[in-house]
Amino acid sequence: MMKGGMAGLMKQAQQMQEKMQKMQEELANAEVTGQSGGGLVSVVMTGRHDVKRVSIDQSLMSTDEDDKEVLEDLIAAALNDAVRKVEQSSQEKMGGMTAGMQLPPGFKMPF
């Protein structure tokens, strides 16, 4: 590889690292909302997987043991939905970073 080619690759790597750091900060501060039960339960989560808020529709509030189990299932489903959305958002944004870069075949990024 020519000396200029190596310098170009190093410059690209440095630029990518800077972009990755900025993107990771943006992703960490982004919020997604996971839902279940047709919106009866919703969870707001950050890109760091921190739960900011859980909302439960009043119609689900009951002292009946069966209703309690349904509510627990809906909360778990809403949390899982939020986690999937965080992961999907992260993959989409980070995957777009390598577009247009001339990376060697088979080169994999650390994310």
From Swiss-Prot:
For this protein, the record's Pfam families field holds: YbaB_DNA_bd
Q: Where is this region: Disordered?
A: 1-25, 87-111
Write out the GO MF terms: DNA binding
Matches recorded under SUPFAM superfamilies:
YbaB-like
**Where does the source fall among the domains of life?**
Bacteria
Q: Which InterPro entries match?
A: YbaB-like_sf, YbaB/EbfC
Please give the chief subcellular localization of this protein.
cytoplasm
Q: Which UniProt keywords apply?
A: Cytoplasm, DNA-binding
Q: Where is it located?
A: Cytoplasm, Nucleoid
**SS bonds (residue pairs):** none
What quaternary arrangement does the UniProt entry report? Homodimer.
| Protein name (Swiss-Prot/TrEMBL) | Nucleoid-associated protein PP_4268
